[in-house]
A protein has these predicted regions:
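Helix-loop-helix hairpins and the membrane-proximal interhelical loops
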Residues: 1-53, 179-253
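Helix-loop-helix junctions within the multi-pass membrane cores of secondary transporters/permeases
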Residues: 2-13, 19-38, 57-138, 250-338
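Residue-level signal for transmembrane alpha-helical positions in Major Facilitator Superfamily
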Residues: 32-33, 158, 234, 276, ...
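Short polybasic/polar patches that bind polyanions
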Residues: 43, 127, 244, 267, ...
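Tryptophan-centered motif/residue detector
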Residues: 55-57, 82, 153, 167, ...
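Buried hydrophobic packing segments
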Residues: 89-90, 166, 185, 242, ...
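Membrane-embedded alpha-helical modules
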Residues: 95-201, 302-396
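Membrane-interface helix-boundary motifs at transmembrane edges
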Residues: 171-176, 247-248, 290-292
Length: 396
């Protein structure tokens, strides 16, 4: 506690313009693709506006508390987030499961992550399932977002093409957040084409909605198990690796326990989980945020505080995004996930030893099949592991 208070007292002196802008940039990125994905998942799950606002409230506030307190405690730029791969999984899962079943999956997944942190078996658990198989499942889960980006071309070609051009031009010039430029150009084109609805906004605090869980074997296997694996492998593992590569000691077990506890508390209010950031972690941890490594924690504090403030206005956020054309939201989600789709596909297929197992997992996950009411990600994971074990035995 003394270290936390000391770092809090040092915050005004340690904060620099570069750390401030890095923290705000992380928030801006999270306001683009990830929020668009939540809104898509909410549509699939037939959430009303209050339920969607509650989901955003739980995600934003939980992520903010995670990053704020851990950054202050360890003087490390730890960035909180919700798992975008997990939200992508929910978009397929909510079509086959009730809201109450999804909440039960959130609770079980959070409890499992807490258990992993308490026991310290994080790395051992990651070694049980081959990483290429998990990456193939992730690529399969995200695949439809990339496809949907181009499905929107006939519907609204001007917006989609403008956003694509903005994204790749920004990438070409090395901008840190190309998806933000896509959003700005997409908004400009939508305004020019008069496709933005007139907002009827009321600035009010979010009103969290409580949902009682309903446990089922199907939701445990199709949602809870993949959610846990995706969160550990695509959020905590790369997020902690970013901190290690930046020269910081990584409080992995503490982060797992704290993130799992926040996820557990937010689950009944439709929060899909809180964890360390992966994609945006490098923005706060690198020298671009602040040359002095001992001051970079302020980027995590700024990000956490801003997350909390935005989360409290969850209903307003839903109203703002509700004014935008569906093509813009779909393009935003797809563009935001392009790097993740590319890297997960590459990681799954680059090692010849695991390539066949990864292909089985990828194709099965993309297929969308759900025999026995169990979703395609579960069957893809199961088939991929089985294929790997059979191939390993044959080689032996």
């Amino acid at each position: 506690m003394s270290a936390t208070l000391r770092n809090l007292r040092d915050f005004p002196r340690a904060l620099t313009w570069s750390a401030l802008t890095s923290g705000l940039l992380i928030v801006l990125i999270s306001c683009t693709g990830p929020v668009a994905m939540v809104l898509q998942a909410a549509r699939v799950g037939h959430f009303n506006q209050n339920q969607t606002a509650s989901w955003l409230w739980a995600c934003w506030v939980g992520s903010g508390v995670f990053g704020l307190l851990l950054s202050l405690r360890y003087r490390i730029p730890i960035i909180g987030a919700w798992s975008t791969p997990s939200v992508a999984l929910l978009i397929t899962g909510l079509a086959d499961h009730s809201l109450a079943e999804a909440v039960s999956a959130y609770l079980v997944s959070a409890a499992l992550i807490i258990l992993v942190g308490i026991t310290g078996i994080f790395q051992k658990l990651l070694d049980l399932v081959p990483r290429p198989v998990i990456m193939a499942m992730l690529a399969g889960v995200l695949f439809d977002f990339g496809v949907e980006l181009f499905r929107q071309l006939p519907t609204d070609p001007a917006i989609v093409i403008a956003m694509l051009l903005a994204y790749f031009i920004a990438r070409r010039f090395g901008w840190r957040a190309p998806v933000v430029s896509s959003l700005l150009i997409g908004l400009l084109v939508a305004f020019l084409l008069d496709e933005v609805k007139t907002p009827h906004l009321s600035w009010s605090l979010a009103n969290p909605v409580f949902v009682s869980p309903e446990f089922s074997i199907s939701s445990m296997l199709t949602l809870a198990l993949p959610l846990t694996l995706l969160t550990l492998t695509t959020q905590y593992a790369p997020g902690m690796a970013v901190l290690t590569n930046s020269g910081y000691p990584t409080p992995t077990n503490t982060a797992l326990i704290f993130g799992g506890a926040l996820s557990f508390l937010g689950s009944p209010f439709l929060g899909s989980g809180v964890n360390s950031a992966a994609i945006t972690a490098a923005i706060g941890a690198g020298p671009e945020a602040e040359p002095d490594a001992s001051r970079r924690y302020t980027a995590g504090v700024v990000c956490g505080l801003t997350y909390i403030l935005i989360g409290l206005m969850g209903a307003t956020m839903v109203g703002l995004f509700g004014t935008l054309p569906s093509a813009l939201l779909a393009a935003l989600a797809g563009l935001g996930l392009l790097p993740a789709i590319g890297s997960s596909t590459h990681d799954s297929l680059s090692d010849p030893q695991y390539r066949e197992a990864a292909m089985v997992t990828l194709l099965l996950t993309v297929s969308g099949m759900h025999p026995l009411s169990l979703g395609a990600p579960f069957w893809g994971l199961l088939a991929g592991v089985a294929t790997h074990l059979i191939a390993k035995r044959i080689r032996a």
